[in-house]
Amino acid sequence: MSDTAETQEAQTQEAQTPQLSMQRVFLKDISFESPRSPMIFQEEWKPEVGLELNTKSRQVGENVYEVVLEITVTVKNNGNTGYLVQVQQGGLFVISGLDDQQLHHALGAFCPATLFPYARENIDAVVVKGSFPAIMLAPINFDALYIESLQKQQAETTQ
């Protein structure tokens, strides 16, 4: 086998090898609201935490995908909103060599799970800057959420 043929074969195998790497993490948007400040600081603090998650993804280049993890945290105290934090944590991921199902799973579960610690840290930082006690969100099983989402989609299409 010639050197050229070996090189082409190696390049073909490399192109088919699944690859997923994070190129960049960025904060796309962040918002903090504390509608009852400063009166809220005079009340006994018994927070009720509400959490909403959403993910978006889109292809932005050859094998390059933007994934955005959107998190909204609403904290109520005695039934009134103490604060609201909205974060859009973005990431650029280079993904190749995956079939459509694997790609969908990577974009819907793996990439958001990778972004979550960054979003959690940004949420915690802004809450503390708002003069509230630190909030450390518990880890989230994005694989389970992804499977649940698929099951809902399948149930809707069979109806």
Curated annotation (Swiss-Prot):
Bilayer-crossing regions: none
GO CC terms: cytoplasm
Annotated keywords: Chaperone, Cytoplasm, Protein transport, Translocation, Transport
Keyword S-adenosyl-L-methionine in annotation: no
Chief site of localization: cytoplasm
GO MF term list: unfolded protein binding
Gene Ontology terms describing biological process: protein folding; protein tetramerization; protein transport
InterPro entries: SecB, SecB-like_sf
The UniProt record lists the keyword Chaperone: yes
UniProt-annotated location(s): Cytoplasm
Family: Belongs to the SecB family.
HAMAP family, alphabetized: SecB
Function (record text): One of the proteins required for the normal export of preproteins out of the cell cytoplasm. It is a molecular chaperone that binds to a subset of precursor proteins, maintaining them in a translocation-competent state. It also specifically binds to its receptor SecA.
Record note on quaternary structure: Homotetramer, a dimer of dimers. One homotetramer interacts with 1 SecA dimer.
Name of the protein described by the UniProt record: Protein-export protein SecB
Species whose genome carries this gene: Marinomonas sp. (strain MWYL1)
Protein encoded by which gene: secB
